[in-house]
UniProtKB/Swiss-Prot annotation:
Changing residue 39 to A: Lack of activity. Does not bind pyridoxal phosphate. GO terms for molecular function: alanine racemase activity; lysine racemase activity; pyridoxal phosphate binding. The active site is at residues 39, 266. Keywords: Isomerase, Pyridoxal phosphate. The keyword Glycosyltransferase does not apply. One of its GO terms (cellular component) is cytosol. Pfam families: Ala_racemase_C, Ala_racemase_N. This is Lysine racemase. Homodimer. It catalyses: L-lysine = D-lysine.
Length: 371
């Protein structure tokens, strides 16, 4: 998708807020090392925009989901540590070794196949251990031990550098399942050789359980919390300790006075009850501003203004208190005057969780670092 750089709609990303959240996360978790998840376009904030400023914000490494995300970062000239979290097809193992990625491996069979095609460049291996997420990774101690022994026996092709598990409910007030996974983790790794990177703390574990993870709490592998979203949405931790890292803004492209009884947008789901000033904005569900956000209060000139009518692919309308000139700034998420629209506000309005709101932002949205 083409980035719409000649359009007023944009994401304004705050470097200072990101740096603050990094330091806050390290402080709360006690982690000495923080790897920032920049998968899925950095949770919608912009893969390269965030990756380019991560190191100066205190981030010690990057984590992506797929090989192509890592390659894009490397091709942008960024030489930071990169972890590939998701499984990759074994035929691409030489590419992962070429770019010096810490590569997640989920089975001995994968290692055996990779051993046949790897060249002089060693593959840095990150072993996945399934303690209850039931997504990827080995489940038995024997399988884990066999993987480690294979890596040691084939050190000409592999470097055993990482091991991890992923907690499914570390941000849940009911920590029963977290405790079950934690206990399973320690049972599985007991007595086995550990690499230099032992990482189990996702955002929830880092914020609420770090002291319960002795020997495994020096690395925080996080995303949500650094992007300014409290993982439990205020249940287990204070929302106001984190800073929002972006604002979403646009500007009026058309303004007209509509008489009473007129339908607005597709299906005429909103009908004016009186003469109403209507403004048009160049943003829609094609940008990730979803249909679920219909009727959300936008901010214009320090006032709350209701979005009206069905949200179209590229445009939507807003009811104005009076006529505004074309080009007037509109804040969808962020501050205007005494009011602020947060991700939590949009979540309460729509039912869409904060991290899903941002991940939905499409590549068409212009992204810019503002401080």
């Amino acid at each position: 998708m083409v980035e719409a750089i000649h359009r007023s709609t944009r994401i304004e990303f705050s470097k200072s807020s990101l740096a603050y959240n990094v330091q806050y996360t390290k402080q709360v978790s006690g982690a000495k090392t923080l790897w920032l998840a920049v998968k899925s376009n950095a949770y919608g904030h912009g893969l390269l925009q965030v990756s380019k400023i991560a190191r100066e914000c205190g981030v010690d490494g990057l984590a992506v989901s797929v090989l192509d995300e890592g390659i894009a970062i490397r091709q942008a000239g960024i030489d930071d540590f990169i972890l590939i979290l998701g499984p990759i097809d074994v035929k691409y193992a030489p590419i992962a070794s070429k770019y010096h990625f810490l590569t997640t491996v989920s089975s001995l069979d994968w290692l055996k196949s990779a051993d046949k095609i790897l060249g002089k460049e060693k593959l840095s291996v990150n072993l996945a251990v399934d303690t209850g997420m039931n997504r990827i990774g080995v489940r038995s101690k024997k399988d884990l031990k066999d993987e480690i022994e294979f890596l040691q026996e084939h050190s000409d092709h592999f470097s055993y550098d990482g091991i991890f598990t992923h907690f499914a409910s570390s941000d849940n007030p009911d920590d029963h399942y977290f405790q079950r996974q934690k206990n399973r983790w320690y049972e599985l790794i007991d007595g086995l050789i550990m690499p230099r990177y032992v990482h189990v703390m996702n955002s929830g574990a880092a914020m609420y359980h770090s002291k319960e993870l002795p020997g495994c709490n020096s690395i925080a592998r996080v995303g949500t919390v650094v992007y300014g979203v409290e993982p439990s949405e205020g249940v287990l931790g204070p929302i106001d300790k984190l800073k929002p890292v972006f604002e979403l803004k646009s500007a009026l492209t058309f303004v007209k006075k509509i008489p009473a009884g007129e339908g607005i947008s597709y299906g005429s789901k909103f009908v004016t009850s009186r003469d109403t000033w209507i403004g048009t904005l160049p943003i829609g569900y094609g940008d990730g501003w979803l249909a679920e956000y219909q009727d959300f209060q936008l901010l214009i000139d320090g006032q709350k203004c209701r979005q009206v009518g069905q949200i179209a692919m590229d445009q939507m309308m807003v009811a104005l208190p009076h006529e505004y000139p074309i080009g007037t700034e509109v804040t969808l998420i962020g501050k205007s005057g005494k009011y602020e629209n947060t991700l939590y506000d949009l979540h309460k309005h729509s039912g869409v969780p904060p991290w899903k709101i941002t991940v939905a932002f499409s590549d068409r949205l212009k992204r810019m670092v503002v401080d």
